[in-house]
A protein has these predicted regions:
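Bacterial N-terminal signal peptides
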Residues: 2-15
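Beta-propeller domains with acidic blade repeats across secreted/periplasmic ectodomains
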Residues: 15-182
């Protein structure tokens, strides 16, 4: 019995490869190469609307009523910016953050984005965006950006959010930055 346990222990303790390859490494692909890798039903077609440099690390997107694509992008993810980088106590802007909500538009009608507006900048992992605005504003959206759910609005018509209003929050995010806008 002891010999069987010893043999079993030694067999299970056999050395494993130090760094098993779990994911096949590949170099970066162009958007066109990525498109060729899609598998879609016969009646479907995939078209490229936007790629880098217009967008970078998109995390959420939604089409607005004016036919424009609203995209939240984050460089901070998965680590939220600490409070010492917040511009104010509400967390309305983060110093040195490249997280933003951008609006992409097809101006010339060729089916591809050719205009991008950085609508709201200095955000903190904006994982949700819903294009919507009050009638008195030119444009706007409801978005989650740590630590609140915000209403961002363009009140002047320059394409930039000059109003940042907390709708709900603040909410805890210290343990997990996922799904706060669910």
């Amino acid at each position: 019995m002891r010999l069987t346990c010893l043999a079993l222990t030694l067999a299970l303790a056999a050395p494993l490869p130090a760094n098993p390859v779990l994911i096949r490494e590949t170099g970066p692909l162009t958007p066109e190469e990525e498109l060729r890798g899609f598998s879609v039903p016969d009646d479907f077609e995939v078209q490229l609307f936007a790629a880098e440099p217009l967008i970078n690390k998109p995390i959420n997107l939604a089409w607005g009523g004016k036919g424009r694509l609203w995209v939240s992008s984050t460089v901070e993810y998965p680590y939220a910016a600490k409070k010492d980088r917040w511009i104010d106590e509400r967390g309305s802007r983060v110093r040195d953050s490249h997280d933003a909500i951008k609006i992409l538009e097809d101006v010339d009608g060729d089916g591809k984005a050719d205009k991008v507006i950085e609508f709201a900048d200095g955000l903190n992992i904006p994982t949700g965006v819903l294009p919507w605005h009050r009638p008195e504003h030119k444009d706007g959206c409801i978005a989650w950006s740590i630590p609140n759910i915000w209403y961002f609005a363009d009140t002047t018509g320059d394409g930039k959010a000059d109003l940042r209003e907390v709708l709900f929050g603040p909410m805890g995010y210290e343990r997990d930055t996922h799904g706060m806008c669910s």
